[in-house]
Design a protein with these regions (language model features):
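Positively charged n-region of N-terminal signal peptides that target proteins for export
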Residues: 1-11
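Hydrophobic membrane-targeting signal helices
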Residues: 14-19
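Extracytoplasmic metal-acquisition and chelation regions
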Residues: 7-9, 20-338
Length: 338
C-alpha cells in the first residue's frame, strides 16, 4: 500500500510539472523557498533565515507524524522548493518517489539522518514486543558522508533493512549538528546571504549548547537515572547522550497504543520497585496507560516533548525547539530529583 501511495503521488507531481510550459514567477518576489518535513528542521530554518526566506512545514501542526501521508498538493509544494529538508528513514518512505518526480527542480536537498550516527530501535525489558528481540545487539550507524550536499543525486540508503530510531534531534548535541547542516544547505542555495545565515545559526546553536550543559548537569547530579514511559519512547538519543536508563510500553516508532496486561504490570512493578516519582507520556501520545500506572502507584504523570510535530496551539504561540526542550528540562527535573 505504501508503494502504491508513493507512485500515485509521484505521478500526480510529474503531471503537474509537465503541465507547466514555463517556470512560474514566485509570488513573493523571489524569496528563497524552504520546505521541511518535520518541526525541528522548520524551527532551525526559520531561526537561521529570519525574514529573508519563506519556510514551510509540510507536516502541519496537530497532525500525527507516524500516520502522515503526503497529498498531491504537498508533492507540488516540495517540487517548488529551493531547499528541501527531510529526516529520512522508514517514516518518510515516500520522499524518494517525490524527489525522482521533481527531478532537478529542487536546488538543494538534505537528508538529516546522514549527518549524525543513527541508533537501532531498541526493545528493552518489559517493552511490548521485547520477547522477540535481542536486547544486546550492536547499535548501527549510517556510513560517514564526506559530502552532504545532495544536489538531488541518486542516493542509496538503508539497504540492509536495519530499523533505525528516527528521533535524532532529541539529543541536543545532535540538534547542534543538524542546525548547522540546515544552515549549510540554505547557504548553498543562497550564498549572497551566507554571512547573515551563519551568524544566526551560531547564535541559535549557542543557545542549544547552553541548554545542553544544563541537561548534563541535571542528569549528572540526579539521585537516580531511570525514566519510565507509559507510552512510546522517542527519546533514545536524548537518554543515550545523558546516560539515562529507561523502560517504556513501546519503542519510538511503534504504531501500537494498547499494551498487553504483562507490559502494564511490568511498568507498575518497576515504578513501585524503583520508587519512581514521575511516569512520562509524550506529546501526541496516549495518556490511558500512564493514568493506570499512576492510579496503581501514586506516581505523578508528566509529558516529554519529542517535537516531531507540535500542536496547533504551540505552533501559533511561536514555540521553538528551545522552549519545548525547556519544558522537557522542567519535567525531567521533577522526575530525576524528587
Amino acid at each position: 500500500m505504501k508503494r502504491i501511495i508513493s507512485l500515485l503521488l509521484a505521478l500526480a507531481l510529474a503531471f503537474s510539472l509537465t503541465a507547466c510550459t514555463a517556470p512560474a514567477e514566485k509570488a513573493d518576489g523571489g524569496k528563497l523557498q524552504i520546505v521541511t518535513t518535520l518541526f525541528p528542521y522548520y524551527d532551525f530554518a526559520r531561526a537561521i533565515v529570519g525574514d529573508r526566506a519563506d519556510v514551510t512545514l509540510l507536516l502541519s501542526p496537530g497532525r500525527e507524524a507516524h500516520s502522515f501521508e503526503p497529498t498531491p498538493i504537498d508533492a507540488v509544494t516540495i517540487s517548488e522548493a529551493d531547499v528541501f529538508l527531510y529526516n529520512g528513514g522508514e517514516g518518510e518512505y515516500w520522499v524518494d518517489s517525490m524527489l525522482d518526480a521533481a527531478g532537478e527542480n529542487i536546488a538543494v536537498v538534505a537528508r538529516m539522518m546522514d549527518y549524525v550516527d543513527a541508533l537501532d530501535e531498541e526493545y528493552v525489558e518489559g517493552m511490548q514486543g521485547a520477547d522477540g528481540h535481542d536486547h544486546d545487539h550492536e547499535h548501527g550507524s549510517h556510513d560517514d558522508h564526506d559530502d552532504h550536499d545532495h544536489d538531488h543525486e541518486e542516493d542509496e540508503h538503508d539497504s540492509d533493512e536495519v530499523e533505525y530510531d528516527e528521533h535524532i534531534w532529541t539529543s541536543p548535541k545532535n540538534a547542534v549538528v543538524l542546525c548547522r547542516a540546515v544552515c549549510d544547505a540554505i547557504c548553498k542555495a543562497d550564498p549572497a546571504n551566507e554571512d547573515f545565515y551563519r551568524a544566526n545559526c551560531d547564535g541559535y546553536c549557542a543557545q542549544i549548547e547552553a541548554l545542553d550543559a544544563r541537561f548534563a548537569a541535571l542528569c549528572e547530579s540526579a539521585p537516580h537515572k531511570l525514566l519510565v514511559f507509559a507510552d512510546r519512547f522517542p527519546m533514545l538519543y536524548f537518554c543515550r547522550e545523558f546516560g539515562l536508563d529507561y523502560r517504556a510500553a513501546f519503542h519510538g516508532c511503534s504504531g501500537d497504543t494498547e499494551p498487553s496486561l504483562a507490559t502494564i504490570k511490568y511498568l507498575i512493578d518497576k515504578v513501585e520497585d524503583e520508587d519512581i516519582p514521575v511516569v512520562y507520556t509524550i506529546d501526541f501520545g496516549t495518556k490511558k496507560v500512564a493514568a493506570v500506572v499512576s492510579e496503581c502507584t501514586g506516581a505523578a504523570v508528566d509529558t516529554l516533548y519529542s517535537m516531531q510535530t507540535v500542536s496547533r496551539a504551540d505552533f501559533d504561540a511561536g514555540e521553538t525547539y528551545l522552549t519545548l526542550m525547556e519544558r522537557n528540562y522542567e519535567a525531567l527535573r521533577k522526575g530525576l530529583n524528587e
